[in-house]
Amino acid sequence: MTQRISLSRRQFLKTASVTAACGLLGLRESFADMAGKKNRPNILWLTSEDNSIFWLSCYGGTNCRTPNIDRLAKEGFRYTNCFDNAAVCAPTRSTWITGMYAISNGTQPMRSRNNIPHDVIKYYPDLLSKAGYHTSNWTKTDYNIGGRPDKECWDLLDKNKRFGWRYRKAGQPFFAVVNSTSSHESRAHGDAENTHNDPNKMKLHTYHPNLPAIRKSYAKYADAVENMDNDIKQTLDALKEDGLYEDTIIIYCSDHGGVMPRSKRFLYSSGTHCPLIVRIPEKYRDIWPAERPGMAVDRLVSFVDMPKTWLSLAGTEIPKTFQGTIFLGKDIEPEPEYHLSFRERADERCDCVRMIRDKRFAYYKNYMPYAPAGQYLAYLWKIQAAPAWEKHHREGKTNEITGRFFRPRVSEEFYDTVKDFDDVHNLIDAPEHQNRIARMKRAMRKKQLELYDSGLLPESMRQRRAQEHNLTIYEMARDPKLYPLESYLDAADTALERNSADLPTFVKGMSHSDSGIRYWAVVGLHLLQNDAIPAVRTLENALLDESDEVKIMAAWTLVKLSRKETGLKCLRDLLNNGTTTHRLLLNVLDWMGTDAVPLVREYLTSNPKQAKNILAKIAQDHGIEISK
């Protein structure tokens, strides 16, 4: 039965006026929304590969000339404190595409292609497309993520269509990535003769010895950076030609630092301190980050901030999963106090480092200090500077600073990057900095917990654990029963202290039910060196551990404690019979030096086809002949 509603004339007029007002308000909001969408800026993101601020003249670089980037800086705003999170391409681009630190996703090891829950984690180009933007990418993806083709998130990704905005609908706002590979590390490979830039005029980092091969490598890469600068010009010229220069926010940055040895892949300033220049047309001057173009901006910016900021500039949805801070625009967020970077496996080489810094000071925690930073890495050694530097060191010609790269590391480092951009004067024990160091250590731990840092287990161990429970590493790291991060952080910190008073703690930890705790316990025993002799029986028992990561570290420690036969037998069995962590085993055999030579010689004599990468380098360094 329909209920009849009776209204007086006054009630009717009142209701009608309210309805009309609501309609007008809705119409006004609709027009405002349409106007807002109509005025949305085009965004052009120019990226170059592998160059830190060291190489650009607008940042004070003297080795080459970059007039086009310099001009962009004069027309825009030059950020002086922009830092990459990973110091190498694939983990960086994983961070960019998801708006999340790769360590939070489990995508931090180079070329790992670990899966993530794609129903939870969104890619920023998808969100821009959903909001009406035309998105294009020329032509760099390399997102290091499994479960989805990289190109799927872009409206246009075609190597033959460099200027993607030319393929949008009329009047459609665009977000275009145009990447230059001209400054990629590979451009410094091989012969370095007949360079345009003079090797004798190159300014070297203080950690590099003054060798002709190193100077030539610098000059060859300086040529590459100048070619990259010309790529930037070509793209900007195309934008001007299309009449879009004053309608487009232009962003330029590199994807990380590099490329001379000890920059790319390493979390020092030369690997992480990157250029960031933003040109904002006059029509959008209300979001200028400084009073006028040409000015420097000293705000602290992390690469993880970028995708969130781009979405904000476009007025699009920003998922809660995005972990950065909006550093530009109407919705700018408070400046963070610190930036966090991470390092894990790069190609065939295992490592694990975390770095936290502000605008001046940087604190590092080396989770694998028993390994030198300067490990042979096949791709890096294609630059003449790398083998030349290594040879110089092996001949005993390096000093305390130039030789440190090839020696085992301390557990912690701390640098004043304003006075010491090259990060060579470790101030970790300086009395005047102890309060600051303590604050930064607390901030690092807090951030690791906030991000569910997945790197506190060896790569193979965390992959295995996630697979056993049919989970992604992202999901596993958020399950405290499977991944008790606080306990791992505590265990790692205790191990890295190298305090002989912790021997009973390590011995007890070796019988823990969690292989992660056992791993950090054996690392602690390893770092105690001869102070671990009372734990020899415990280490021998660990050779039967169900975790090969624990076995390998226990065996190496026994070799160092003069129980060579016992330790080498375990390593021999793993090498001959297979292991769940073959890459770690090969790294350890290299780190062992001469102790591993008999084992490697025996193995390669029977398996000459395995003389590749690390094993081939061990053979070369120690004169092991390999039959053809």
What feature does the model see in each segment?
Residues 2-406, 421-442:
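Formylglycine-dependent sulfatase
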